Amino acid sequence: MTFHRSQNLREVATKHCYQIQGPDAVRGVGGWDTHVNQGSTSGQLANNLANLGEGLVAYAQALGEEWNNTTVVVLSEFGRTFRENGSRGTDHGHGTVYWVLGGNVRGGRIVGEQVAVNPQSLLQNRDYPVLNNYRNLLGGLLGRTWGLSASQLQNVFPGARPDALQLL
């Protein structure tokens, strides 16, 4: 399921609270391929971030008290280049960020491995490096949230070293 507006996440929250029993779900949000005219404080990227933020707020509000039992992870399968391309956008890159939200998340901080952004740390002088493997993060969060064993997590994320980064 792909979302483009906060109303969609509000509807999902309603279904989550009243129809779904047990752990749920992977949801997608499209429209993030910003090769052309990405913008910064205005434009495609700013609009997408605003819509995502509004959707997440609507989702949390619609869940009400159930938000305290909910963990949301926002991630992308790839990052974007640190440097702008010739079309005023960014191309597919390597490193990215993950957002972890929820009523039981110890947030309000940046966690995981980090490096200063400088020419020496960028791959091909344009890409932020992959420092935090999504398999490790998701494995750690799923293990803590759903009580999955190390062997169960290895079936889903072979070779991963689950680490919830002290977020839960």
Can you say where each PLM-predicted feature lies in the sequence?
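Ligand-binding pockets and gating/stacking loops
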Residues: 1-168
